[in-house]
Regions:
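A contiguous, surface-oriented mixed alpha/beta subdomain in the mid-to-C-terminal portion of proteins
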Residues: 1-49, 53-56, 77-80, 94-101, ...
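Short N-terminal amphipathic alpha-helices
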Residues: 59-60
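A surface-exposed, charged beta-strand/loop segment in the N-terminal or early-internal portion
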Residues: 64-66
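Short, motif-level signal for alpha-helix interfacial/capping segments enriched in acidic residues
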Residues: 82-87
């Protein structure tokens, strides 16, 4: 049976645990940083919770959080396997044997990271996750139901090439620029009038 989950950025959702309890009576939310070398940062990291489609939590996610504070996942696998696999993705290896946090649960990064990959590579990265739903109706699917689950290790198994990293960073810069323009138009509209006229 397919179950739906939300992978939420607790740093971007104020009082996330109180909100989860208020919206869905959720008392157990799985921090991806728990049981890792980053456990002391668990209150700021990603959190996995199960969700019922059409519920108050699902609607709040779609209306308020989906744009930047998390992703919707679906899986047939046991919740413990989904959690284990997602936990294995929290950090990556970069060139020069550098370890870095990986915000794969940011919908902008998820789209850029997975959407253009070959099926075989995407299937491996998604592990037991069958579907990821992103804003704008974007759906990323895993095509091999027998994909193994990765396990967290102190040394990351996932490596991002310099080219992939640059691709993801460029997207973040574009996203920041767009948000800056929107902020200026919203709060300083009168000051900006006439600036685009030669």
């Amino acid at each position: 049976m397919t179950r739906a989950y939300l992978l939420l950025d607790s740093h971007l959702i104020p009082n996330i645990f109180a909100r989860l309890f208020e919206l869905a009576n959720i008392t157990v939310a799985h921090s991806l940083y728990l049981t890792t070398r980053y456990a002391e940062m668990a209150s700021f990291g990603p959190v996995l919770v199960s969700v019922e489609p059409g519920s108050a939590l699902a609607n709040t996610f779609i209306e308020q959080w989906q744009g930047r504070a998390g992703i919707w996942l679906e899986s047939d696998a046991d919740e413990a396997l989904v959690l284990e696999h997602l936990r294995s993705l929290i950090h990556v290896r970069l060139a020069g044997d550098v370890t870095a946090f990986f915000r794969f649960y940011d919908p902008c990064i998820t789209r850029l990271w997975l959407a253009d990959l070959a099926d075989v590579e995407r299937n491996l990265l998604m592990g037991p996750v069958r579907v990821i739903r992103l804003p704008g109706g974007v759906v990323i699917q895993q095509n091999n139901p027998h994909q193994p689950c990765a396990r967290y290790a102190t040394t990351p198994w996932l490596t991002l090439s310099a080219q992939t990293l640059e691709h993801l960073c460029q997207a973040r810069r574009e996203h920041f620029t767009q948000r800056l323009v929107e902020h200026g138009q919203r709060y300083f509209a009168a000051c900006l009038q006439g600036l685009d006229v030669p």
